[in-house]
Amino acid sequence: MAASTAALRGITKQYKDFTLGPVDMTVPAGSIVGLIGENGAGKTTLLKILCGVNRADDGTVDLLGGSPADAATRAKIGVVFEDAFFYGSFTAAQVARSLAGMYGARWNADSFSAYLRRFGLDAGKKLKEYSRGMRLKLSLAAALAHDPELLVLDEATAGLDPV
């Protein structure tokens, strides 16, 4: 693995009433990093830029030696966003496959099933039958199932019971 997992240089993002940055940050390999700030400070925006969900207006992101714009790089990460939305008629397995597909990750049904069992979830259960905490566990199972090099969590423990 590289000396750093992620390096952000001069990252800015402009919204109507808010400007993020410039942000310079390096995440050393093997580290655990938390972003702490007030509501609306731009933490989720920064994570979405890191993962290639949003684009910065300026600056560069080096993610695992590549660009978050590249599918091969995105396939190396596991992501849980607090605001992820899926239709309630989807089953847990359909949601997880969709999440893996969004990031280009290889689908590992055996690993996903093991995480579902560990978290007490049912792959065939419809999303509309899951509580918010159960949905977060589902997102976490999907993010972990392909053994990512980097795990990005956006408030992934808010409303989550212990596992």
What are the language-model segments listed below?
Residues 51, 59-73:
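Conserved ABC transporter NBD signature motif
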Residues 36-38:
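The feature captures the beta-strand-to-loop junction immediately N-terminal to the Walker
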